[in-house]
């Protein structure tokens, strides 16, 4: 069997390392850009939903949210109907860096797909979606623990 996950892992680590260098100039620590983007795209999301969206455990989410809140990129607000629920929103500072993060992501995406036709790029995307869907059940079971 072809070990595709090793390749996916190497690609992920390389792109993550590059992103961390780029985002250091806007005071985002390792991997925090992803949280800012997802919260920006899903205003009012709760931590559990963010955990499922990003595919990281709740403890990691809690640490990241705490750091991002401390650094002024996001804020937690109580749900108007249930004060125990804390909803996440980007602050003005978070909104200001969002376009920069997206530009960097688009650049990385175009570099990664250099030499691919539009059809090939779509095929890669479709295959990766299928792979993610295959592991979603395992993730849901793991995350429920």
Label each PLM-derived region with a short phrase:
Residues 1-26:
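N-terminal leader segment of winged-helix/HTH proteins
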Residues 9, 37-41, 102:
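Short, locally clustered residues in the helix-turn-helix/winged-helix DNA-binding domain
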Residues 14, 18, 34-37, 96, ...:
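Pre-recognition alpha-helix immediately N-terminal to the DNA-recognition helix
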Residues 31-33, 59:
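Key DNA-contact positions within bacterial/archaeal DNA-binding proteins
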Residues 42-46:
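Short capping segments at the starts of secondary-structure elements
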Residues 47-48, 59, 66, 86:
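Residues within helix-turn-helix
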Residues 51:
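The alpha-helix within a helix-turn-helix
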Residues 66-129:
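Charged, amphipathic alpha-helical coiled-coil/dimerization segments
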């Amino acid at each position: 069997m072809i070990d595709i996950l090793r390749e996916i892992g190497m690609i992920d680590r390389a792109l993550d390392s590059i992103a961390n260098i780029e985002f250091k100039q806007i005071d985002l620590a390792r991997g925090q850009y992803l949280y800012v983007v997802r919260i920006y795209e899903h205003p009012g999301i709760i931590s559990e939903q963010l955990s499922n969206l990003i595919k990281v455990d709740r403890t990691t989410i809690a640490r990241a949210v705490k750091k991002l809140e401390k650094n002024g990129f996001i804020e937690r607000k109580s749900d108007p109907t249930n004060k125990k629920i804390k909803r996440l929103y980007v602050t003005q500072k978070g909104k200001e860096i969002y376009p920069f993060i997206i530009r960097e992501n688009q650049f990385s995406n175009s570099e990664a797909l250099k030499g691919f036709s539009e059809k090939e790029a779509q095929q890669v995307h479709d295959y990766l979606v299928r792979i993610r869907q295959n592991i979603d059940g395992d993730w849901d079971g793991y995350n429920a623990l």
